[in-house]
């Protein structure tokens, strides 16, 4: 189906290894039967994430565009988003029925935010393996993202992380902004992310999204 105001653009940020590409893959596979989807990935010097999504068959290869930012990944999603906006324009031209475009940033830190000209909603992914103190360190990515995803929760016992502490700190730092724990490799917690996207993105829902884990 086609959204009345053009495709919903969802920015996905997070440090290297947090699970951004896994999140993008899982979201594409859960939503692709219901919505027309495309992806733009950002890497500094390669198109590794785009190639990985193609190998994982998240979407047909022509719906996945990799851009090489050639420098600080923050700039390409915030101060000068032109390379991403050009990729989005090309995808819109090729697929005029698009409902959702995911924009996956390159590896970034807690100061990363998406330009409002680029993303309508922002998801930020951190990993428990980075340490239980990450939520309370704050930064715009933690405090301002529309949905904070604390991934790899299954590994908490092995990296000496207390999930209750992370939950308390995230709630304190984010106020009323939502967050959730996930184990994206197994699809745990994905349903909550999808529900947030559908509700806050104004998507029209049929039956396909009910199959997500």
UniProtKB/Swiss-Prot annotation:
<keyword id="KW-0996">Nickel insertion</keyword>
<keyword id="KW-0963">Cytoplasm</keyword>
<dbReference type="GO" id="GO:0005737">
    <property type="term" value="C:cytoplasm"/>
</dbReference>
<dbReference type="GO" id="GO:0005525">
    <property type="term" value="F:GTP binding"/>
</dbReference>
<dbReference type="GO" id="GO:0016887">
    <property type="term" value="F:ATP hydrolysis activity"/>
</dbReference>
<protein>
    <recommendedName>
        <fullName>Urease accessory protein UreG</fullName>
    </recommendedName>
</protein>
<comment type="subunit">
    <text>Homodimer. UreD, UreF and UreG form a complex that acts as a GTP-hydrolysis-dependent molecular chaperone, activating the urease apoprotein by helping to assemble the nickel containing metallocenter of UreC. The UreE protein probably delivers the nickel.</text>
</comment>
<comment type="function">
    <text>Facilitates the functional incorporation of the urease nickel metallocenter. This process requires GTP hydrolysis, probably effectuated by UreG.</text>
</comment>
<dbReference type="GO" id="GO:0016151">
    <property type="term" value="F:nickel cation binding"/>
</dbReference>
<dbReference type="InterPro" id="IPR003593">
    <property type="entry name" value="AAA+_ATPase"/>
</dbReference>
<dbReference type="GO" id="GO:0003924">
    <property type="term" value="F:GTPase activity"/>
</dbReference>
<keyword id="KW-0143">Chaperone</keyword>
<feature type="binding site">
    <location>
        <begin position="14"/>
        <end position="21"/>
    </location>
    <ligand>
        <name>GTP</name>
    </ligand>
</feature>
<keyword id="KW-0342">GTP-binding</keyword>
<dbReference type="InterPro" id="IPR027417">
    <property type="entry name" value="P-loop_NTPase"/>
</dbReference>
<dbReference type="InterPro" id="IPR003495">
    <property type="entry name" value="CobW/HypB/UreG_nucleotide-bd"/>
</dbReference>
<dbReference type="InterPro" id="IPR004400">
    <property type="entry name" value="UreG"/>
</dbReference>
<comment type="similarity">
    <text>Belongs to the SIMIBI class G3E GTPase family. UreG subfamily.</text>
</comment>
<dbReference type="Pfam" id="PF02492">
    <property type="entry name" value="cobW"/>
</dbReference>
<dbReference type="GO" id="GO:0043419">
    <property type="term" value="P:urea catabolic process"/>
</dbReference>
<keyword id="KW-0547">Nucleotide-binding</keyword>
């Amino acid at each position: 189906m086609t959204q009345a105001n053009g495709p919903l653009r969802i920015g996905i940020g997070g440090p290297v290894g947090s699970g951004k590409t896994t999140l993008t893959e899982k979201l594409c596979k859960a939503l692709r039967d219901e919505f027309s989807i495309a992806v733009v990935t950002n890497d500094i010097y390669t198109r590794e994430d785009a190639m990985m999504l193609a190998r994982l068959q998240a979407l047909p290869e022509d719906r996945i565009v990799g851009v090489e930012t050639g420098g600080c990944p923050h700039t390409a999603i915030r101060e000068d988003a032109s390379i991403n906006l050009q990729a989005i324009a090309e995808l819109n031209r090729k697929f005029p029925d698009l409902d959702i475009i995911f924009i996956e940033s390159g590896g970034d830190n807690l100061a990363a935010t998406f330009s409002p000209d680029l993303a309508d909603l922002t998801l930020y992914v951190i990993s428990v393996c980075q340490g239980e103190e990450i939520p309370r360190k704050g930064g715009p990515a933690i405090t301002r993202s529309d949905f904070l995803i604390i991934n790899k929760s299954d590994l908490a016992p092995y990296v000496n992380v207390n999930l209750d502490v992370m939950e308390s700190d995230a709630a304190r730092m984010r106020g009323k902004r939502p967050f959730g724990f996930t184990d994206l490799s197994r699809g745990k917690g994905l349903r909550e992310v999808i529900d947030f996207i559908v509700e806050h993105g104004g998507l029209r829902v049929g039956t396909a999204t009910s199959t997500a884990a």
